[in-house]
Amino acid sequence: MDYRSTLNLPGTEFSMRANLVEKEPRILEKWQKMNIYDYLLKHRENNPTFVLHDGPPYANGDIHIGTAMNKILKDIVVRYKTLRGFKSPYVPGWDTHGLPIEHKVTTMLGEKARSMSQTELRKACEEFAKQQIEMQKKQFQRLGVIGDWENYYATLNPEYEYKIYEIFAKLVEDGYVYRALKPVLWCNNCGTALAQAEIEYHDHDSPSIYVKFKMENSENEYIIIWTTTPWTLPGNTGIAVHPDQQYVKIEVGSEIWILAEKLLKMAMQEIGIDEYRILEKFKGHFLEGKQAVHPIFDRKSRIITADFVDMETGTGCVHIAPGHGEEDYEFGHLVNGLAVISPVDEKGYFTEEAGKYSGMHIEKANKQIIEDLKNNGSLLKESTIKHSYPHCWRCKKPVIFRATEQWFISVEKNNLRQRVLENIQNVAWIPAWGKNRISAMVEERPDWCISRQRAWGTPIPAFRCSKCSEVVLDARLIRHFAEIVKKMGTNAWFELSEKQLLPDGYVCPHCGSEDLVKMNDTLDVWIDSGSSFEAVLTTRPELTFPADMYLEGSDQHRGWFNSSLVLSVITHDKPPYKTVLTHGFIKDAEGKKMSKSLGNVVDPLEVCSKYGADVLRLWLASSDYFNDIRISKNIIFQQVEVYKKIRNTIRYLLGNLQDFSVTDSIGFQKMLPVDRWALGRLQQIIKSVTEAYESYEFSKAYNILVKYCSVELSAIYLDIVKDRLYVEGKHSLKRRSAQTVLYNILKSLLVMFSPILAFTCEEAYEFLNFGEKKYQTVMAENWPEYKEEYIDTNLMNDFEELLQLRDLVLKALEESRQNGLIGHSLDAKVAIKTGSKKTLDLLKKYSAYLEEFFIVSKVEICNSDENLHIEVEHAEGEKCERCWKYDPLTNSDSEFPNICPRCMAVLKEKR
């Protein structure tokens, strides 16, 4: 007789095969139709708000694994906060101005770009940026990111630009903005100034030269400098020494050289001098004010003292070119009055001020300058050095310091630096080291160069007077132009005449002339994105200022976190965020940086089209994202295997609940002991997972949940209750007791996993039809509540010991299986022998449940003088064809042949 039809076998349409590639787009369509974003906001309408403010990615090119990671992390946070009951609006944004887009557009246009007006080029950039936004928007949505995608913000929108000018007017009005000739980081290739946040450091080969400058009024005395930028020597006007370090005069042949004592030995080895004699020792300040003669140009080079001179490399005598370095400018020009000579144009060619090097590119001039030094006897040593050197973030070319007239924000005005540092203390930084990092950056940052020499940007509404040549910029001009921008956008600056741009009756405040000419500088894009707190948070009623969280990569300590903080402190005297959460960067499996040339790039869209977005999300959740994390095709495949285990657990739970309704639930006290233990463990899991999410340790939540599914559920609890679920009467207390726990586990798992496995949990939630209150989406559910009353401490302690015993029993069963004594564990009878009263009492207390607990046919508890000992025998009696357990009374009823008494009772009840 076939008894299979009498078993309560699991059944569900939730498929074992994920097929996420086909299912995820259908779920996205569902979310779009139901307008999930508005649905969730309305669902939490009267609840406390949690605002994660989106740092705008750059609207240029397909999303990559880094931008995908950032958006998924934000989505996990927003989904978690929504499930915790918060109204969690999320407005995505895009950074749209600046060099990368202009560079891309001019490259695409080729020769045509050269003949275009600024307005035409700007319109081409705007069109390109908008296309990129639409493309990236679809790609971010494909990752499962929920947000207000129809009402995103973009820095090119007139209403956003208007807010930039509101902030800028305040900066000018309060005296923070000034114009000066100062050395700034400059990209010759792109022809513009750069901010610190636009710099990347890469290894670079530079010439390394030791040069002697003859001391004035001396026949044979020289001061020795070392430099890796020979091209800056035409800008040299001084030499710096440390005031308190020891310097020496040494005799080398017929010459006397001056350099630092600490660097003497190293420098002599580098130059190749074996024989020299120390003549004199003195402190560096004794050299202050003396003059040396420039080795190429007919001018003097004054010796100054500066504390920044270090004793690590070189000679302790630093060549100073105030037009080509921040410290050179500060100590050379501002402190000591050295002339600023910067004979390099915007493309890196020497100007007429460089004399015979005029018209020569600085790279080519390097070689010529070295040759000239060699020919006039000033060059002591030439070699090549590999060192970390600043490069442009866009074109990847080395940058230089070049003195040009630029607009700056003073970080000393109105005690700004100190105020920013104080406000840093009022923010929660995760990880905690972020506080020290951004503090160090603020402490060290120079005045902020905010002007750029590009067409595609937010124009600085400044004018130059044709009569007196003074530059004019004031708050009235900015606010007047802001009103024009509100109606026409910033293209108005390039399309309208000066008369149309100026307020009625406006004249030069310096000389009274009406003849003012508009200038063409644009604002640093970090002003654009850094103004988002004003342009987005304060203007949208569903958002709050300050935001609850900013979440970006750790590079944003010097980027968006920094610019936003400075502007917010100036305008509101408080930070724009309450918490700052940072993530690391993505490397390949070996920890190498990703690059197309190495062939180690993982495309997030490719992962989605091959495995599904949930696998990508699972990989991210598995990673300690506070630090740099690794990815490769193999690492992704490992997560595919983990995903299968999770999905199978969900499927098994759904399958065994097919005939369950919440009205069938059994009260805690009526449950079987193992079910009460499982429900207690679920509470502990809920507590641990919640704590992990609360501290944004998603990898911790992942590890707890994955281990729970694969070990505690699959290998322990679900294994133990399988017999009861399949064999006991459908409506019996024993079966409903287990089903009640399974229902609680399933619902808790779906909610706790849903911030990570957004699509899979949504799919599974659709199969949750157990008569409970249900919403259109799992995201509308409430986070599982930790219930202390479900934790019976004594019972939990008992089961901790029983589980240790179970491990020993399973080990003994496996040995018996290997020896051929048994096949399946149900073939076994287990005798547990011990002299421990504590263990005997424990086993007797749960004796009625031990066969199920150990998954055997018979358990005997034996008092013994020996230590704990487990014996396995083949069980007595015949095997029941329905439940596979052995029982001496099997086949004792002709109506139900080959059936044990337990199964017989179930079948008679069914009848």
Swiss-Prot record:
Main localization of the protein described in the UniProt heading: cytoplasm
Intracellular or extracellular location(s): Cytoplasm
Motif position, 'HIGH' region: 57-67
Pfam family, one: Anticodon_1
E.C. numbers: 6.1.1.5
SUPFAM superfamilies xrefs: Anticodon-binding domain of a subclass of class I aminoacyl-tRNA synthetases, Nucleotidylyl transferase, ValRS/IleRS/LeuRS editing domain
Keywords: Aminoacyl-tRNA synthetase, ATP-binding, Cytoplasm, Ligase, Metal-binding, Nucleotide-binding, Protein biosynthesis, Zinc
Catalytic activity: tRNA(Ile) + L-isoleucine + ATP = L-isoleucyl-tRNA(Ile) + AMP + diphosphate
Annotated binding of L-isoleucyl-5'-AMP, by residue: E552
MF GO annotations: aminoacyl-tRNA deacylase activity; ATP binding; isoleucine-tRNA ligase activity; tRNA binding; zinc ion binding
Binding residue positions for Zn(2+): C880, C883, C900, C903
Cofactor(s) required for function per UniProt: Zn(2+)
Transmembrane segments: none
Motif stretch ('KMSKS' region): 593-597
Cofactor note: Binds 1 zinc ion per subunit.
Oligomeric and partner information: Monomer.
The protein's role, per its UniProt record: Catalyzes the attachment of isoleucine to tRNA(Ile). As IleRS can inadvertently accommodate and process structurally similar amino acids such as valine, to avoid such errors it has two additional distinct tRNA(Ile)-dependent editing activities. One activity is designated as 'pretransfer' editing and involves the hydrolysis of activated Val-AMP. The other activity is designated 'posttransfer' editing and involves deacylation of mischarged Val-tRNA(Ile).
Family according to the record: Belongs to the class-I aminoacyl-tRNA synthetase family. IleS type 1 subfamily.
Comment block on domains: IleRS has two distinct active sites: one for aminoacylation and one for editing. The misactivated valine is translocated from the active site to the editing site, which sterically excludes the correctly activated isoleucine. The single editing site contains two valyl binding pockets, one specific for each substrate (Val-AMP or Val-tRNA(Ile)).
Protein name: Isoleucine--tRNA ligase
